[in-house]
Amino acid sequence: MSGGLAPSKSTVYVSNLPFSLTNNDLYRIFSKYGKVVKVTIMKDKDTRKSKGVAFILFLDKDSALNCTRAINNKQLFGRVIKASIAIDNGRAAEFIRRRNYFDKSKCYECGESGHLSYACPKNMLGEREPPKKKEKKKKKKVPEPEEEIEEVEVSEEEGEDPALDSLSQAIAFQQAKIEEEQNKWRPSTGGPSTSDDSRRPRIKKSAYFSDEEELSD
């Protein structure tokens, strides 16, 4: 859910509304019951006129419940309003998705230019104060810790030894390193030995009669 909203529990279905009410009118009417997130009026797809039905999405379910109790079967502009918690039809996520209207030259309500829907002459309850624009926070140049971790992981992958192409090679490589460390610290009776001597395997004859040879450390 977007921002923690639960539209299946916080959306009010309102019917028998006056056809002349606009989105802004309904916003002002229902805002007294709580924070209104979105207002959707059902309109005829051909005439674009209201069907007298709307969905009011509140920020929390308590506000939605208070709204239904307050206005259900109550008169509004001469009509008896029906209100209830909307039944989720599986399109809740789509309903709460914010829509951006990039064409600011025309009013969303009436389609005429020169004003926006907040100041549309068709608003029965007058103009509504437009919401304040959110100030964009400047991003800090310092990378976030998560990004730093990702960069470290990438650099490690790039620096891998090409000899470690398989599991067996990796085991052999690690074993060779261990033996090299052991040979460095092993006391020698015949004087100091070079690193090349310590790493070179010694060959000795087998104890039993054979032409085979076996390796010793």
From Swiss-Prot:
ZnF bounds (CCHC-type): 105-122
Protein name: Zinc finger CCHC-type and RNA-binding motif-containing protein 1
A GO cellular-component term linked to this record: nucleoplasm
Residues with the Phosphoserine modification: 155, 210, 216
Occurrences of domain RRM (ranges): 10-88
Pfam families cross-referenced by the UniProt entry: RRM_1, zf-CCHC
Keywords: Metal-binding, mRNA processing, mRNA splicing, Nucleus, Phosphoprotein, RNA-binding, Spliceosome, Zinc, Zinc-finger
Molecular function (Gene Ontology), one example: RNA binding
Region annotated Disordered, chain positions: 120-217
Highest rank taxon of the organism: Eukaryota
InterPro entries for the chain: Nucleotide-bd_a/b_plait_sf (IPR012677), RBD_domain_sf (IPR035979), RRM_dom (IPR000504), RRM_dom_euk (IPR003954), ZCRB1 (IPR044598), ZCRB1_RRM (IPR034219), Znf_CCHC (IPR001878), Znf_CCHC_sf (IPR036875)
Organism: Rattus norvegicus
